[in-house]
From Swiss-Prot:
Subcellular location: Apical cell membrane
Name the UniProt record assigns to this protein: Adhesion G-protein coupled receptor G2
Region (GPS): 566-615
Free-text comment on this protein's domains from its UniProt entry: The Stachel sequence (also named stalk) in the C-terminal part of the extracellular domain (ECD) functions as a tethered agonist. In the inactivated receptor, the Stachel sequence (also named stalk) is embedded in the GAIN-B domain, where it adopts a beta-strand conformation. On activation, the Stachel moves into the 7 transmembrane region and adopts a twisted hook-shaped configuration that forms contacts within the receptor, leading to coupling of a G-alpha protein, which activates signaling.
């Protein structure tokens, strides 16, 4: 255009030529500006577009004004290398929108300052930072490159000296350099020159003026910092002769002083203990982070500190050598509290000094050193050693500890355990006259409550409003609480008698900042919540019968898509320095801004009568759990079949033994069903539901014991009190006793205290999760209402069982040897049936002690969970009359019995006729319900004699009569469980000519002798 304009300009008219020339100049300038703008936009677009070769994306690369730091880094790279870099966002701090106000970053971030640093690593540089030899032995797929080594050292240094930091690094392989730009957040007491001493070619600039307002919150993430568009000031210059002194700014304009106001530690505590979501695609940028973290599993105690944790997938990540080389990495990490390694220059700096120029030109110097912190801690320890503390002095100590929590983490780490002991000692030595007392400070809250170990109620400690910390001690946590811990009523139920008097107070602590809980072994994990703890008179309590529930709010509620983990503080980890452990902890519920920590729930049937109430090894607990649930499931199925059979077929339920058996089967079925539901209900940790389930489980257990005892009592009436025994409304009275007495016992326990029931823990599984169960929490209630109750029933049942065995031995002495052999198997089957019917197998619980504990626990679990199955086998499937009813109504074809089949007819070799006066045999030798209840339900008889007693004739015209039929001395042992007793006047064959039957009628007491020739 310039050429064409010059071509057609009129000659001899200088004014017009000059005007056209000016117009051309304006157009040229406009085009130049336009071309420059397009180039910049194209450059930004290329940076914002993802690269196919990049295997790792930097979430927050920062850029500043002119000259841009990222541009300087990128300018050193060639075209191919630039294509490997993927930048999602740029941080433009040069342009400030006119419609927004400019404020100082220090005015909204109290006690914290931000710096921007730039450093270039050369291949032949020798830094005063020694290389960590663990890098060579790390789990990276290949040998670490120069960029990875230098980036690791930079990461470790920033991790030690700063609160939060962000790194952007780019490798220029052509120039053999590594260019890194980082942003750090430091406590105002930290001297930034200590960082400059570590690396010799670093340039650090303060970040002060930003687009913000006084109401703008302090940035806690790279995105928030980017939105503020902070401008960079002139680089800081440290004096050569005073490398650890105050930094001197090269700018003539003063730097505003950081006001001493509210603490910014909420942000520092906002990061969780967590692992990256995808371990396969990410490795650590530091040697210690390259390996997967494995947590030990110490036994948890009540002296615990809990916090949920959350995965941060962008932490400490670089590309593995097996993937395409990534030239850009991003690190977001809180400081890990640990003693500074010799690989950094931090330990050589005994005192951190920061000098900040005030607007008038004055200098304010804040100092913080290890000797100073140790002196303060020692002073408090000395005061605590003198004895009890008055509330005023204790409050001053709490405030002092609160201030110390905001000291540089590198200086605070060696004193962390001592400070935790100081906090516990304050609560232990605190002298107060009321029931409860609470002391609060900006970053620490402490509450102590006097308790009675023998009558401890459920207590919840909750903290509210982190800006103005308040605490409460109630039965339930308030809705607006930011952290709460609930101690169950069974907390001290297992304490030895010598420690009951010592457990006089419970202490709760709430830490607004996790400064004392830095775990160097979890470098890729960080906290997302506050920290809450509890202890009982500074003692350790193990084997809690009910879990402790911890609910903690997330400081940053936007992290909902990340995986959380519940952890507690183990004082014995890391060589006594303490560390986070997830042993036995799991997440019950996770919401947008809250995590509730609890544990998984399974249990063994042996818990119901675990007299020792001690925990089993995890592997054995798992095996017992499988046996328990399989056995309970099978028993429930076969008990249901037994109930349906006896209820559906009227002919087999007319006698008393059958009716008692129906009641026992119903009780056992309900017991098994409630037991199977118990662990599932316990998962929800709902107090009301758990108490209800525990009450029903207790009730049906006692009902089952009672009906077993009534079976034995019925046998006593039939075998011992044979004559002159008449009970009106026999079954009705049995039902009142069988279902009523357990209800009275459970009602008394509930009236005393509903907290006698609840969630209890009875051991651990191999994965570390505790075995929790809704059951009786009080040991006194357990031993009286379960163990004592069962002992009475068990003694009665064993006595009756012995009577049966004695009767069997007496009769067998009269039998011939050949006849004894033929009945041995039947007798054994009868004994086995009585063993399960009377609950003799429950006696295994009395032997589950000492070295044989495990063996009898297995026997207990196997036989008692299968009790319903064995009852079905011996009292349903093995009974001839029951099988005939099945064949008659359930089978078809040849297996089905004819309608006119006399199912109850007894076939004998010597007896061809039946008389109406013949005695009637019943299944359990029981009392007859009426004169018409004549159907036989005999289980086992001698095959050489009568298969079944006749059920076709009337035994007596009186109600509740007892009939006994004797044939040649053959005793049906099962019949001895009820109302039948067989004897003979002489030993003869089954077809003998003379038989005698003894019949008693309850009203007349007369004897009828029927002799058949």
């Amino acid at each position: 255009m310039l050429f064409s304009g010059g071509q057609y300009s009129p000659v001899g008219r200088p004014e017009e030529v000059l005007l056209i020339y000016k117009i051309f100049l304006v157009i040229i300038c406009f085009h130049a500006i336009l071309v420059t703008s397009l180039k910049e936009n194209a450059g930004n677009s290329s940076l914002l577009s993802p690269s196919a070769e990049s295997s790792l994306v930097s979430l927050v690369p920062y850029s500043n004004g002119t000259p841009d730091a990222a541009s300087e880094v990128l300018s050193t790279l060639n075209r191919t290398e630039k294509s490997k870099i993927t930048i999602l966002k740029t941080f433009n701090a040069s342009g400030v929108k006119s419609q927004r106000n400019i404020c100082n970053l220090s005015s909204i971030c109290s006690d914290s300052v931000f710096f921007r640093g730039e450093i270039v690593f050369q291949h032949d540089d020798h830094y005063n930072v020694t290389q960590n030899q663990d890098i060579v032995n790390s789990t990276f797929a290949g040998v670490l490159s120069l960029s990875e080594l230098k980036r690791t050292e930079l990461n470790k240094t920033l991790q030690t000296l700063s609160e939060t930091y962000f790194i952007v690094c780019a490798t220029a392989e052509a120039q053999n350099t590594l260019n890194c730009t980082f942003t750090v957040k430091l406590n105002e007491t930290m001297n930034v020159c200590a960082m400059m001493v570590t690396f010799k070619s670093v340039q650090i600039r303060p970040m002060e003026q930003c687009c913000c307002s006084p109401r703008t919150p302090c940035p806690s993430s790279p995105e928030e910092l980017e939105k503020l568009q902070c401008d960079l000031q002139d680089p800081i210059v440290c004096l050569a002769d005073q490398p650890h002194g105050p930094p001197v700014s090269s700018s003539s304009k003063p730097v505003p002083v950081v006001p001493q106001a509210t603490i910014f530690s909420h942000v520092a505590s906002d990061f969780s203990l967590a692992e990256p979501l995808d371990h396969a695609l990410m490795t650590s940028s530091t040697p210690s982070l390259a390996q997967e973290t494995r947590l030990p599993s110490p036994q948890p105690t009540i002296s615990l500190t809990s916090s949920p944790a959350i995965d941060l997938p962008v932490q400490h990540v670089v590309a593995s050598s097996s993937l395409p080389q990534t030239d850009l990495s991003h690190t977001l990490s809180p400081v890990q509290s640990s003693i500074p390694s010799p690989t950094t220059a931090a330990p050589s700096v005994p005192e951190k000094v920061v000098a900040i120029s005030t607007p008038p030109g004055e200098t304010v110097v804040n100092t913080s050193s290890v000797p100073d912190l140790e002196a303060q801690v020692s002073q408090m320890e000395k005061a605590l050693s003198l004895g009890s503390l008055e509330p005023n002095l204790a409050g001053e100590m709490v405030n002092r500890v609160s201030k110390l929590l905001h000291s540089p983490l590198a200086l605070l780490a060696p004193l962390a355990q001592r400070l935790l002991k100081v906090v516990d000692a304050i609560g232990l030595q605190l002298n107060f006259s009321s029931t409860t007392i609470s002391l609060t400070s900006p970053s620490l809250a402490l509450a102590v409550i006097r308790v009675n170990a023998s009558n401890f109620n459920t207590t919840t400690f909750a903290a509210q409003d982190p800006a103005n910390l308040q605490v409460s001690l109630e039965a339930q946590a308030p809705k607006n609480s930011i952290g709460a811990i609930t101690l169950p009523s069974s907390l001290m139920s297992n304490l030895p008698a010598s420690e009951v008097e010592l457990a006089s107070r419970v202490q709760f602590n709430f830490f607004e900042t996790p400064a004392l809980f830095q775990d160097p072994s979890l470098e890729n994990l960080s906290l997302i919540s506050y920290v809450i703890s509890s202890s009982v008179t500074n003692m350790t309590i193990k084997n809690l019968t009910r879990n402790v529930t911890v609910a903690l709010k997330h400081i940053n509620p936007s992290q909902d898509d990340l995986t959380v983990k519940c952890v507690f503080w183990d004082l014995n980890r890391n060589g006594g320095r303490g560390g986070w452990s997830s042993d036995g902890c799991s997440v019950k519920e996770k919401r947008m801004n809250e995590t509730i920590c609890t544990c998984s729930h399974l249990t063994s049937f042996g818990i119901l009568l675990d007299l020792s109430r001690t925990s089993l090894p995890p592997s054995q607990m798992m095996a017992l759990t499988f046996i328990t649930y399989i056995g309970c499931g099978l028993s429930s199925i076969f008990l249901s079949v037994t109930l349906v059979t006896y209820i559906a077929f009227e002919k087999i339920r007319r006698d008393y033994p059958s009716k008692i058996l129906i009641q026992l089967c119903a009780a056992l079925l309900l017991l098994n069903l409630v037991f199977l539901l118990d662990s599932w209900i316990a998962l929800y940790n709902a107090r009301g539901f758990c108490i209800s389930v525990a009450v029903f489980l207790h009730y049906f257990l006692l009902v089952s014991f009672t009906w077993m005892g009534l079976e034995a009592f019925h046998m006593y009436l039939a075998l011992v009190k044979v004559f002159n025994t008449y009970i009106r409304k026999y079954i009705l009275k049995f039902c009142i006793v069988g279902w009523g007495i357990p209800a009275v016992v459970v009602s008394i326990v509930l009236t005393i205290s509903p907290d006698n029931y609840g969630i209890g823990s009875y051991g651990k599984f191999p994965n570390g999760t505790p075995d929790d169960f809704c059951w009786i929490n009080s040991s006194v209630v357990f031993y009286i209402t379960v163990v004592g109750y069962f002992c009475v029933i068990f003694l009665l049942n064993v006595s009756m069982f012995i009577v049966v065995l004695v009767q069997l031995c007496r009769i067998k002495k009269k039998k011939q040897l050949g006849a004894q052999r033929k009945t041995s198997i039947q007798d054994l089957r009868s004994i086995a049936g009585l063993t399960f019917l009377l609950g003799i197998t429950w006696g295994f619980a009395f032997f589950a002690w000492g070295p044989v504990n495990l063996t009898f626990m297995y026997l207990f679990a196997i036989f008692n969970t299968l009790q319903g199955f064995f009852i079905f086998i011996f009292y349903c499937a093995a009974k001839e009359n029951v099988r005939k009813q099945w064949r008659r109504y359930l089978c078809c074809g040849k297996l089905r019995l004819a309608e006119n089949s006399d199912w109850s007819k007894t076939a004998t070799n010597g007896l061809k006729k039946q008389t109406v006066n013949q005695g009637v045999s019943s299944s359990s030798n029981s009392l007859q319900s009426s004169c018409n209840s004549t159907n036989s339900t005999t289980l086992l008889v001698n095959s050489d004699c009568s298969v079944h007693a006749s059920g076709n004739g009337n035994a007596s015209t009186e109600r509740n009569g007892v009939s006994f039929s004797v044939q040649n001395g053959d005793v049906c042992l099962h019949d001895l469980t009820g109302k039948q007793h067989m004897f003979s006047d002489k030993e003869d064959s089954c077809n003998g000519k003379s038989r005698m039957a003894l019949r008693r009628t309850s009203k007349r007491g007369s004897l009828h002798f029927i002799e058949q020739m």
